[in-house]
Amino acid sequence: MLAARRLLRSPRITGALSWSRWSSDAAKATTETSALLQNAEKRQQLLNELSEPLEQKGRPAIDPKETSVMLFPGQGTQYVGMAKDLLRFPGARRIFELANEVLKYDLLKICLEGPREKLNRTEHAQLAVMVSSLAALEQLREERPKAIETCVAAAGFSLGEITALVYADALPFDKALRLVQVRATAMQAACDQAAGAMAMTLYGPDTNLGEACARAQQWCLDKGVESPYCGIANYMYPHCKVVAGNVEALEFLEQNAKSFKIRRMKRLAVSGAFHTPLMQSAVEPFTKALKTVRLQDPVIRVYSNVDGKPYRHAKHILTQLPKQIVRPVKWEQTLHEMYERKQGVDFPRTFECGPGKGLVQVLEKVNAKAAQSSFNVIA
């Protein structure tokens, strides 16, 4: 896919630091012109195969098992010592060097040494996860280059969506670093304005989670909480969602879980109610920063958290990505959209690149057959 990117997205923006640029620089010693053309044509055929109904194709279909899909994790997956095993790959080391040059501080040192409190701060955690995920791609490129060459789609959870856009050459790497800095700072400021929380929530078919959230929100209002909110922030898998809102609202749900037939609630280690209206103040600075970036059409399908559908073009990214800050992450819907196919049609290989194994575990609960061909490239 490196070759395809060069041909399909040429010329690149002058001065932009795209994933294909720095990744191909790390591997260009073995690249030949004939291979570029062959890989580009093959990749374009893969994309065409996926975009046309099978009965309308006039050429032999490419086996879906020969294609790949990338998934990228979000904030909360970071841990002290992350990326240590990636440093044996020159490309991964170069990614961190470039990040340090742009950020003007040693992000890798924070990943490796912490302390945990520093790494978990939103302004560091989001950058650490994104850069480590891109570094994990370098391990994949070294060990299974075909997975990169035949990749036809990508998606990322929350912050991971920005990682996916970098991977798809829609967003330059250096600009993405600055954008994530703005995003993290603005989201932390929103957290400071209203104390919020998030909780993984397991429930049964007899649970009315919407009513429970509405009751919690009304309870906050009655108690004098200003402009309270409680609602679904992440759609994970059947009978599992992340609920977020004011701290008081989640405390109400936890105390009354049995009466609402909620089976379990587990608080997430985050500083606010992400992907809810409580983050509204973060939208404007993020949108302003995004407008300064010259976006490109993704060279592969990248799915939006907002509606679970692929981005259509660069302008679509500009309008859709800011909404993600205050809208629920529709991850379950995204997985259905990505892996929906006719009976008997094989699934692509799926690679989760970044810290943790959570996205593959969720895929197992949403589509067990698709998960049989999934792999982790752990940062």
Swiss-Prot record:
Keyword Transferase: yes
InterPro entries for this protein: Ac_transferase_dom_sf (IPR001227), Acyl_transferase_dom (IPR014043), Acyl_Trfase/lysoPLipase (IPR016035), Malonyl_transacylase_ACP-bd (IPR016036), Mitochondrial_malonyltrans (IPR052760)
Reactions catalysed: holo-[ACP] + malonyl-CoA = malonyl-[ACP] + CoA
GO terms for biological process, alphabetical: fatty acid biosynthetic process
Broad class of where this protein is predominantly found: mitochondrion
GO MF annotations in UniProt: [acyl-carrier-protein] S-malonyltransferase activity
Protein name: Probable malonyl-CoA-acyl carrier protein transacylase, mitochondrial
